[in-house]
């Protein structure tokens, strides 16, 4: 029997860990002669393209992995492929269908069954069943919802959780994952009970054997994988486990591979903090879910978090200067209105994370949040991703306002392109939330929200916005935007707002002549000629102390683009004001 495991990913750079686990597990433990293959697609592909690929592969059985971002697309595939391959057996699985399998099969007569929860052993049992119909029937198989020949839908009991160490390592052939993000898990389940999350349903927390984990981490390190994203729901919930992994990647660091972890900041203890402090800049990045700082909200969603403790940890890690921190907020939670969310936003913004994700509540099937929707006046979209429209605290008009703010945060904060301009702008607006609120209004009023803007155009727009609200400090904004621009862009054509205040050709020549004779700043360019030095660097004159307190005084900066900060990708900067002055005196 030919079996195709299909995955419809959100982006090409993503890979689907689940289908690779099912294939590897079945090939190791399944007593079958089935030919199992994997087909990975994206939601950006045309449906016809995916149907053609499935049809040409001629599978007898098609298994599709379902998530909140692809369910609608997967359902369409099921409906259409059954028309052109009426004999095909179709099973689906994944978190988006595990908790309402009966309704899914009622909605999709083309589908034969749903695999609930962990699918490795269930998939093996299904292969055995279809290969040998004399085996125990589907009625005795745990972890499935299926359709009998009569059309009746039957839901069997859940399967017990499995030993995670039995799942084979899926990345032996790295050619399959070239240019893709590597996902890796060392634990399943979650110790917390957050009402908006399906992970809270799985209370059986289990871990992969650490000796296996070390061996697999070494594989990633040896292959110089750019990034490994751990999918563990709360990686540091078990101290010894986290410390072992972190010690290993630190001691075996190849200077290239980055590891991404979701952590609970308030669980990080002194020993873990001290270890993090010693890591190479960029070795790890931490994703920390705050969601809200409203105490009533935190209590209602069953979240165990002390924000003061989280804030202390985030600030301390920030002071190390070696870890990218990504903090999350969720709009649409109970007891959180527009003003309350604004306060949560300001609280998190003050921690200065590298990324601040403003997300919107997704009402997942089977979650406690879905049960309480009527109590909360919670209305959400009927199609995946089931995103909140409004609640009794947050009217739809305010949801739309927050959508605009989300876009501005993504464009102007998370891009890390405006690290000097934004703090200066906030002084005028008093609080960060107001700045992004007004910026979103400015975009809408000027018809900018419906257009696609080049990266460099964002600087021009922000300059116009700053002039509109704070014309008196127009020159200061021009200087700061020029600084931000050259920190990120090795551009030889000047932006319009930068003006003509640049170093002279003679100053330029004198500086690079001196640097060519004796490396005072650009030591890493030892074997480069003067012409190459100029290409990889930039010198800019400012009339304000842009790196300091913004006093009106001359400041000349050298930008080194070969040496960038691994956390925000900004060029290394040297103040060369005195050197330029001395050279001109000679």
Language-model region placement:
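A structural motif corresponding to the C-terminal lobe/cap of the Radical SAM core domain
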Residues: 8, 58-60, 239, 251-254, ...
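Radical SAM enzyme core and accessory elements
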Residues: 2-6, 47, 60, 407-586
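Short hydrophobic segments within beta-strands
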Residues: 6-8, 65, 93, 231
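Glycine-rich beta-alpha loop elements in corrinoid/cobalamin-binding modules
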Residues: 25, 35-160
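A short, glycine/small-residue-rich beta-strand->loop->alpha-helix junction that serves as a flexible
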Residues: 9-18, 66-71
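N-terminal [4Fe-4S]-dependent radical SAM core
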Residues: 1-2, 141, 145-186, 555, ...
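Radical SAM [4Fe-4S] cluster-binding motif and immediate context
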Residues: 165-319
């Amino acid at each position: 029997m030919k079996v195709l495991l299909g995955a419809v990913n959100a982006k090409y750079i993503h890979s689907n860990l689940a289908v690779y686990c099912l294939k590897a597990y079945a090939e190791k433990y399944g007593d079958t002669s089935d030919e199992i293959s994997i087909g990975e697609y994206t939601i950006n592909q045309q449906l016809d393209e995916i149907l053609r690929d499935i049809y040409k592969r001629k599978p007898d059985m098609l298994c599709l992995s379902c998530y909140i971002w692809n369910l609608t697309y997967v359902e369409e595939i099921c409906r259409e492929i059954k028309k052109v391959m009426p004999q095909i057996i179709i099973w689906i699985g994944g978190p988006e269908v595990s908790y309402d399998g009966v309704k899914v099969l009622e909605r999709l007569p083309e589908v034969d069954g749903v695999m609930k929860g962990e699918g490795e052993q269930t998939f093996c049992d299904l292969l055995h069943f279809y290969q040998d119909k004399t085996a125990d029937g589907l009625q005795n198989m745990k972890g499935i919802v299926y359709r009998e020949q009569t059309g009746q839908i039957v839901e069997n009991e859940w399967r017990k959780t499995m030993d995670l160490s039995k799942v084979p390592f899926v990345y032996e052939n790295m050619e399959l994952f070239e240019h893709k993000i590597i996902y890796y898990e060392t634990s399943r389940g979650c110790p917390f009970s957050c009402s908006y999350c399906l992970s809270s349903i799985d209370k059986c927390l289990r871990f992969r054997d650490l000796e296996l984990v070390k061996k697999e981490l070494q594989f990633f390190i040896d292959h110089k994988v750019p990034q490994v994203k751990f999918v563990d729901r709360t990686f540091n919930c078990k101290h010894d486990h986290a410390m072992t992994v972190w010690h290993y990647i630190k001691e075996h660091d190849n200077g290239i591979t980055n590891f991404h972890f979701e952590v609970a900041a308030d669980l990080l203890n002194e020993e873990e903090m001290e270890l993090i402090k010693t890591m190479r800049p960029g070795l790890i990045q931490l994703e920390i879910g705050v969601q809200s700082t409203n105490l009533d909200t935190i209590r209602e969603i069953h979240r165990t978090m002390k924000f003061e403790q989280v804030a202390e940890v985030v600030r301390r890690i920030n002071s190390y200067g070696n870890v990218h921190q990504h903090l999350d907020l969720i709009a649409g939670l109970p007891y959180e209105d527009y003003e309350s969310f604004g306060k949560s936003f300001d609280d998190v913004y003050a921690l200065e994370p590298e990324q601040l994700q403003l997300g919107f509540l997704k009402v997942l099937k089977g979650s406690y949040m879905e049960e309480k929707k009527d109590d909360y006046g919670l209305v959400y979209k009927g199609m995946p991703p089931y995103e909140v429209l409004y609640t009794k605290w947050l009217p739809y008009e305010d949801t739309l306002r927050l959508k605009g703010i989300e876009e501005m945060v993504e464009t102007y904060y998370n891009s890390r392109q405006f690290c000097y301009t934004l703090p200066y702008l906030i002084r005028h607006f008093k609080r960060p939330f107001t700045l992004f609120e007004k910026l979103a209004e400015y975009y809408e009023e000027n018809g900018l929200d419906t257009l696609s803007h080049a990266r460099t155009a964002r600087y021009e727009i922000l300059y116009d916005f700053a002039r509109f609200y704070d014309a008196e400090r127009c020159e200061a904004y021009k200087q700061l935007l020029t600084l931000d621009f050259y920190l990120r862009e090795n551009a030889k054509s000047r932006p319009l707002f930068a003006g003509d205040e640049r170093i002279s050709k003679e100053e330029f020549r004198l500086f690079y002549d001196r640097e060519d004779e004796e490396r005072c700043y650009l030591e890493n360019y030892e074997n480069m000629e003067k012409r190459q030095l100029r290409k990889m660097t930039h010198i800019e004159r400012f009339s304000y102390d842009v790196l300091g307190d913004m006093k009106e005084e001359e400041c000349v900066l050298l930008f080194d683009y070969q040496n960038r900060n691994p956390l925000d990708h900004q060029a290394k900067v040297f103040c060369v004001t005195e050197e330029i002055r001395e050279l001109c005196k000679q």
